[in-house]
């Protein structure tokens, strides 16, 4: 009996449920017309709400604000529902015609039910979006980093007071432009650097801080280039714009921002409007600060109350000197502290001199050495009046204490470059080797190592400073006062000014007048506007001639080279309009170093092949060059650079290169499969290979690129190739590196590749760029790498990924990345939703890691290993929209 009751209850419930379902379906069909009308009206209201909101957002963004994330999400949902509504509305007529029985029934109940249900659900979604579309705030101040923290010397003494004074003055509402003036070496740049770094640490509403080094050679296009790089104007299209067009772009961008512009080392008035800098006002809150040696420059910039940066007082000077010398040296003899005070006093409170002399004296632990320093400083102080003139001889004491004549000569050589120039280390060492300062006859690797040791010595002596690392190249700089001292020494303390003629960055239109060419040993005319070089100067002692970066230069007469029998180094690089060389270059019988890179020379003169002592020949990026046939006549060549040439590299040319028995360094570009095969089969050339570019090899010619072990290979570029895989020719154990010196790899336009697992065998890789390769799915393939017990990318500093639509993985597990500074994910990398990071990654690199992305939604899609990883690295993510 109980069972019957149970069945009756179950049947009742079932009937009720079926009834409700039928009524709901009937409701969807019966109310299609009414719901469609309501949906249409609701969509119109939603669009109006969206348009009003967008106007508010646009106004806020023009004022330099950034739209709230909830605004982005809401607008995205509106865009989606609008698209769905359009699809729904497109079938409206058909669906209404399907209804019958006065709209109560349908000729196809299932289709009408589905359509009616979609209308009903969409109406609810639209009403919900309308209710959530009211925002009290639509934007907030931009959250991206305002500037880059700049390195400072660890020892800064005596600037605390003036720093606070300068900061308060700059931040005062009445201050628009602040000028800092003082003699060279007094600490103006250090003070401006501290101001820059304080902006980076202070939440004061400033959106962007821009640092530009101007120097004596004021060039508008260079300043615009630096500013453009800071604010995201990069790429070929922008670089090709005129100065006026760039000024408009910069003005339009900065007019919407609260910016701070810091100009270091200006020598004359800077026309801010020509650059595109808006006038700072109380309304826009923008600021400009600059440093200069001359008070008159401050007045020309409209600053009539500049701040003078003065030499340190006696107590601060002594404190700085003590810190540089160190307690161990000062306590090595009871008389040394008293003598050391006299040496510090001779530095006249100039921080640069205190730093340089302090470094020099740090290893002097006998009273005799300290007495000698006092004698030198007091003697010069008596002979010179002005502080600047007195400082140069005192700085010379550090030069005199350099360990050898070769180190001294290498130091003086650095003064040939323009003021504030970044000097590429390896290029400088190549000069030194060819000049004979370093013995490079036996072992190039050992000679380069000695060059780096000399650079280290000069940096430790504070005579050079580290200039940083850019594009995989390391640089040094020379302080302008130290450079003045070096030029003073090179001219035999100004007794023979024509010994070393340096007119770098002087905007010369012609070769300078020289009283006596016969005594000139070195001449630097870098970065001028010289158009033609004529005449036949008699230069029996000239060994070095720098003519690079004279972009107006079109002609050099043959007579010019006739009387330079001892010329060893000739640099003609970056003379982009120079289309030929005279045959009389053969007269340069002592020439060892010749650089013609980035010139427009089409044919090498026959006379060049007579330069039997030539060791270093750089022909890179000579896009007009037709041939280098006959290069094997230059039997003494050790370095040949042939990257980025448009000429066809033939097998016969490779055979000529093989005949160069002294060849040690080769950079080369390959654009044919036969030449590539010839190159990789040549043990001699592979052994010398330092940089290689492989371009435009189609899939049929090279399906699989097999690379041998190349111990000295540093850079690889593979572009526009159709190979399906890159593999390693294995002759050693699986874990040994095939490319121990490979540091930079660029892969672009290789649409057959699916992974780059071969990079496992490049343990010192620092830069990896992968662009526009449509089939790459993994950087390191888990399947291929499963048998290799190698942790990749331990030295990687920069990882740039662009236009890789199929990329899903960099590596399947988190990696330590102890050196990683930047990850850049741009343009169509939508399937890459996870980075190989965890909370322990980048411990050494610390908070320096920057993750840049170009897709506004990527930051929301990215998956993190865990909450700790997300908290650690999410603040590092920055939206950067730019072209490659």
Curated annotation (Swiss-Prot):
Gene3D superfamilies: Helical domain of apoptotic protease-activating factors, P-loop containing nucleotide triphosphate hydrolases, Ribonuclease Inhibitor, Winged helix-like DNA-binding domain superfamily/Winged helix DNA-binding domain. Residues 26-66 form a coiled coil. GO terms for cellular component: plasma membrane. The LRR repeats probably act as specificity determinant of pathogen recognition. Probable disease resistance protein. GO terms for molecular function: ADP binding; ATP binding. It holds the Pfam family NB-ARC. This is Probable disease resistance protein At1g12290. Keywords: ATP-binding, Coiled coil, Leucine-rich repeat, Nucleotide-binding, Plant defense, Repeat. ATP binds at residues 182-189. One of its GO terms (biological process) is defense response. LRR repeats lie at residues 519-540, 541-563, 566-588, 590-612, 613-635, 644-664. Residues 139-443 form the NB-ARC domain. Belongs to the disease resistance NB-LRR family. InterPro entries: Apaf_helical, LRR_dom_sf, LRR_R13L4/SHOC2-like, NB-ARC, P-loop_NTPase, Plant_NBS-LRR, WH-like_DNA-bd_sf. It comes from Arabidopsis thaliana (Mouse-ear cress). The keyword Amino-acid biosynthesis does not apply. The keyword Iron-sulfur does not apply.
């Amino acid at each position: 009996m109980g069972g019957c009751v149970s069945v009756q209850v179950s049947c009742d419930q079932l009937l009720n449920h079926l009834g409700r379902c039928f009524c709901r379906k009937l409701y969807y069909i019966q109310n299609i017309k009414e719901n469609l009308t309501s949906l249409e009206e609701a969509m119109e209201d939603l669009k109006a709400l969206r348009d009003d909101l967008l106007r508010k957002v646009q106004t806020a963004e023009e004022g330099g604000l950034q739209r709230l994330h909830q605004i982005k999400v809401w607008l995205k949902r509106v865009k989606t529902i609008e698209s769905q509504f359009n699809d729904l509305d497109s079938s409206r007529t058909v669906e209404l015609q399907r209804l019958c029985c006065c709209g109560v029934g349908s000729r196809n109940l299932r289709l009408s039910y589905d359509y009616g249900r979609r209308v009903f659900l969409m109406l609810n979604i639209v009403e919900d979006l309308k209710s959530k579309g009211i925002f009290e705030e639509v934007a907030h101040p931009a959250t991206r980093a305002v500037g880059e923290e700049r390195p400072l010397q660890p020892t800064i003494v005596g600037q605390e007071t003036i720093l606070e004074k300068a900061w308060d003055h700059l931040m005062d509402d009445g201050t628009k432009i602040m000028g800092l003036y003082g003699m060279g070496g007094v600490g103006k740049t250090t003070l401006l650097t501290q101001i820059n770094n304080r902006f980076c640490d202070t939440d004061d509403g400033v959106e962007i801080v821009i640092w530009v080094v101007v120097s004596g050679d004021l060039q508008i296009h260079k300043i615009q280039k630096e500013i453009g790089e800071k604010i995201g104007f990069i790429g070929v299209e922008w670089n090709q714009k005129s100065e006026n067009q760039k000024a408009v772009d910069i003005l339009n961008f900065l007019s919407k921002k609260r910016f701070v512009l810091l100009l270091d080392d200006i020598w004359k008035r800077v026309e801010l409007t020509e650059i595109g800098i808006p006038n700072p006002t109380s309304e826009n809150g923008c600021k400009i600060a600059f440093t200069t040696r001359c008070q008159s420059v401050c007045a020309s910039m409209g600053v009539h109350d500049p701040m003078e940066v003065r030499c340190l007082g006696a107590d601060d000077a002594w404190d700085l000197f003590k810190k540089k010398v160190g307690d161990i040296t000062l306590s090595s003899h009871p008389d040394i502290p008293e003598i050391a005070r006299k040496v510090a006093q001779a530095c006249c409170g100039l921080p640069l001199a205190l730093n340089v002399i302090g470094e020099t004296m740090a290893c002097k632990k006998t009273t005799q050495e300290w007495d000698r320093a006092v004698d030198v400083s007091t003697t010069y102080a008596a002979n010179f009046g002005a502080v600047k003139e007195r400082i140069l001889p005192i700085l010379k004491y550090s030069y005199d204490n350099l360990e050898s004549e070769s180190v001294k000569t290498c130091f003086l050589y650095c003064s040939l470059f323009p003021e504030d120039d970044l000097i590429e280390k390896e290029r400088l060492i190549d000069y030194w080797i060819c000049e004979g300062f370093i013995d490079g006859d036996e072992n190039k690797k050992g000679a380069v190592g000695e060059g780096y040791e000399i650079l280290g010595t000069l940096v430790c002596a504070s005579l050079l400073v580290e200039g940083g690392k850019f594009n995989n190249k390391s640089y040094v700089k020379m302080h302008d006062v130290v450079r003045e001292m070096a030029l003073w020494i090179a001219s035999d303390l100004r007794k023979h000014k024509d010994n070393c003629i340096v007119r770098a960055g002087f905007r010369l239109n012609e070769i300078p007048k020289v009283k006596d060419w016969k005594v000139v040993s070195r001449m630097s005319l870098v970065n001028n506007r010289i158009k033609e070089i004529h005449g036949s100067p008699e230069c029996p002692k000239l060994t070095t001639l720098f003519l690079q970066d004279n972009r107006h230069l079109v002609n050099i007469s043959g007579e010019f080279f006739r009387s330079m029998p001892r010329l060893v180094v000739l640099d003609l690089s970056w003379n982009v309009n120079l289309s030929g060389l005279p045959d009389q270059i053969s007269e340069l019988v002592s020439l060892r170093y010749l650089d013609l890179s980035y010139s427009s020379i089409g044919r090498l003169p026959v006379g060049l092949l007579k330069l039997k002592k030539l060791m270093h020949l750089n022909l890179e990026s000579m896009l007009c060059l037709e041939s280098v046939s006959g290069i094997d006549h230059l039997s003494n060549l050790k370095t040949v650079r042939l990257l980025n040439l448009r000429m066809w590299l033939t097998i016969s040319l490779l055979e000529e290169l093989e005949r160069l028995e002294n060849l040690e360094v080769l950079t080369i570009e390959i654009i044919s499969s036969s030449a590539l095969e010839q190159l990789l089969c040549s043990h001699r050339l592979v052994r010398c290979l330092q940089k290689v570019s492989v371009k435009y090899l189609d899939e049929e010619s090279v399906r699989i690129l097999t690379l041998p072990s190349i111990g000295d290979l540093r850079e690889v570029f593979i572009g526009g190739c159709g190979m399906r895989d890159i593999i390693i020719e294995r002759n050693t154990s699986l874990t040994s590196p095939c490319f121990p010196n490979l540091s930079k790899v660029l892969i672009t336009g290789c649409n057959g590749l699916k992974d780059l697992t071969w990079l496992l065998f490049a343990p010192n890789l620092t830069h990896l760029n992968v662009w526009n390769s449509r089939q790459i799915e993994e950087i390191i393939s888990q399947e291929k790498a499963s048998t290799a017990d190698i942790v990749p990318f331990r030295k990687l500093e920069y990882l740039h990924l662009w236009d890789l639509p199929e990329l899903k993985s960099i590596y399947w597990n988190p990696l330590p990345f102890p050196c990683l500074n930047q990850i850049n994910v741009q343009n169509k990398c939508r399937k890459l939703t996870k980075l190989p990071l965890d909370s322990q990654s980048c411990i050494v690199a610390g908070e320096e890691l920057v993750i840049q992305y170009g897709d506004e939604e990527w930051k929301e899609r990215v998956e993190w290993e865990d909450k700790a990883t997300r908290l650690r690295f999410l603040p590092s993510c920055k939206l950067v929209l730019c072209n490659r």
